């Protein structure tokens, strides 16, 4: 997908001002390819971008946190980078930031099962791909997961209020607890509703009933 340099610079400028690490996992619509925006734009020092379809990890010792993920390097990915892998240190806060599809094992968008997620051993998985994400939160073993959805709905296949997830992960020696809440961003929204227009003879009368 195309993005202007002005938009990219606006986004990276905001990234540089947030005062915390930013992790990016390129997906099927913005893969990490030769000549892509990921290579053309210099990211701020606090931004880390996954660049391989093989599992990678960014470590933040000051936060006692490891973040695992990968990048799409084309428009499709049928491999499962998390399969047959596990976290390096269960004593740390272990997060996953990834573009993945938990709806079908035959998906061409990095299929991911709850069994694979559970065996990997992370504490929380921040997932992208599904824009209507309200029904895609849960637990896989000791790992909580959620899809972030999209910031703003763009059509009638993205109905309802949209926004971002704010997640707090607390971990002690025994277990981790992820608290997830939604922060609304959309000022407008798309809705799919049914309206009884019985008796309406003109477009104006239909509009009045709506």
Each model region followed by its residue ranges:
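Binuclear metal-dependent phosphoesterase catalytic core
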Residues: 54-63, 147-210
């Amino acid at each position: 997908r195309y993005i202007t340099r002005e938009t990219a610079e606006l986004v990276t400028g905001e990234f540089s001002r947030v005062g915390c690490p930013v992790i990016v996992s390129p997906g099927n619509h913005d893969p990490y390819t030769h000549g892509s925006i990921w290579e053309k734009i210099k990211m701020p020092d606090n931004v880390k971008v996954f660049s391989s379809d093989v599992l990678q990890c960014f470590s933040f010792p000051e936060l006692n946190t490891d973040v695992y993920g990968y990048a799409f390097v084309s428009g499709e990915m049928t491999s499962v980078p998390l399969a047959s892998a596990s976290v390096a240190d269960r004593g740390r806060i272990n997060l996953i930031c990834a573009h993945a599809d938990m709806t079908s094992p035959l998906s061409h968008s990095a299929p991911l099962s709850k069994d694979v997620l559970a065996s990997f051993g992370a504490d929380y998985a921040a997932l992208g791909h599904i824009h209507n994400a309200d029904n895609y939160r849960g637990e896989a073993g000791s790992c909580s997961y959620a899809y972030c959805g999209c910031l703003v709905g763009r059509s009638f296949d993205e109905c309802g209020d949209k926004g971002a997830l704010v997640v707090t992960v607390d971990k002690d020696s025994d277990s981790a607890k992820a608290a997830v809440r939604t922060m609304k961003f959309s000022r407008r929204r798309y809705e799919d509703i049914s309206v009884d227009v019985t008796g309406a003879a003109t477009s104006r009368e239909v509009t009045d009933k709506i």
